[in-house]
Regions:
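N-terminal amphipathic alpha-helix/helix-capping segment at the start of soluble metabolic enzymes
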Residues: 1-13, 121-131, 187-195
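Catalytic cores of alpha/beta
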Residues: 21, 25, 61, 66-80, ...
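C-terminal helical cap(s) of enzyme catalytic domains, especially alpha/beta-barrels
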Residues: 48, 52, 90-106, 174, ...
C-alpha cells in the first residue's frame, strides 16, 4: 500500500534546520524552500540544502524570480529541482526554463560545484544532470494558464507547480477561495500536465484541496508551511 507521506511536502520560509529534522522524523521526505518570499541568504541556504540532501531527502527551491542566476544557483547548490515564479506566456516560459537545462536542451551555465563533485564533467554528466534536476514553471498567471498545454510540452519543462492565490488574482477574481472557477483553472493545468505525462505539484493547505489534488493526480502537494505551523501551534496553546 502506498505511503501517503510520499505525496506530502513541507514548506520553509527560513533556513530552519530544526523544522527539517522535525518534519523528517514525522515522515516528510520533501521540502520546498520559498526563497522568493522567504528569508534565505546564500550561505545558510547552501548549508540547509546540503543537510537535506545528506539526510537522503528531496529539496526544491522556489527561486527569487524567472532569471538565470537564481535558477542556476539553486541547482548548483544541489536542489532536486527549481520552481520558477512569475512565468508569463509560452515565449517567456521557453526562454526562462532553458536556463535550468544544459545544452543542447537549454543554456544553463556550468559550475564545478556540489552537483559535479566539485570537479569537471563529461558529456554523460551533463545528460544525467538534465534528467536529475527538475524544472517546474509556476502556473500562477492568466498568461501562463492560457498557454499551459504548450508550456508543459516544452523539453525544458519537467512538470508544473500550480499557484492558486496569484492565479485567482491574475484572473480577476480577487482572493483565492477554492471557488468553482478557482478549481476549474487548477483542473485545466493539472489535466495539461497529466496529458503530457509530466508531474504537477500544488500547495494544498485544506482538506478539500488535498482531496482535489489527489483526485486529479498530483505528484505531491505541499501541506505544511513553517509560519503557519508555528502560528497554529501558538494559537492552539492558548486554549
Amino acid at each position: 500500500m502506498p505511503d501517503p507521506m510520499d505525496t506530502r511536502a513541507a514548506w520553509l520560509s527560513t533556513p530552519n534546520h530544526a523544522m527539517v529534522e522535525m518534519a523528517r522524523d514525522l515522515g516528510y521526505g520533501k521540502f520546498v524552500l520559498d526563497i522568493e518570499h522567504g528569508l534565505f541568504d546564500f550561505d545558510p541556504t547552501d548549508k540547509l540544502i546540503a543537510l537535506i540532501k545528506a539526510m537522503g531527502l528531496e529539496v526544491y527551491a522556489k527561486v527569487l524570480g524567472p532569471t538565470a542566476v537564481p535558477i542556476q544557483q539553486a541547482l548548483d547548490m544541489g536542489c532536486d529541482g527549481v520552481i520558477i515564479p512569475h512565468i508569463g506566456n509560452l515565449a517567456h516560459a521557453r526562454k526562462v526554463t532553458a536556463t535550468a537545462k544544459y545544452p543542447p536542451l537549454g543554456v544553463r551555465s556550468f559550475a564545478g560545484s556540489r552537483t559535479s563533485g566539485y570537479g569537471g564533467a563529461d558529456d554523460q554528466w551533463y545528460a544525467d544532470e538534465n534528467t536529475r534536476s527538475k524544472c517546474f514553471p509556476m502556473i500562477e498567471s492568466a498568461a501562463a494558464l492560457a498557454d499551459v498545454e504548450a508550456i508543459v510540452a516544452l523539453d525544458t519543462v519537467d512538470g508544473l507547480f500550480l499557484g492558486p492565490s496569484d492565479l485567482s488574482l491574475s484572473r480577476g477574481r480577487g482572493a483565492y477561495r477554492e471557488s468553482d472557477a478557482d478549481m476549474a483553472d487548477l483542473e485545466r493545468a493539472a489535466e495539461a500536465a497529466n496529458a503530457a505525462g509530466k508531474p504537477w505539484i500544488m500547495p494544498a493547505w485544506t482538506e478539500n484541496e488535498r482531496q482535489a489534488a489527489s483526485a486529479l493526480g498530483a505528484a505531491f502537494m505541499v501541506v505544511a508551511d513553517e509560519y503557519g505551523s508555528i502560528f497554529n501551534g501558538l494559537f492552539q496553546a492558548r486554549h
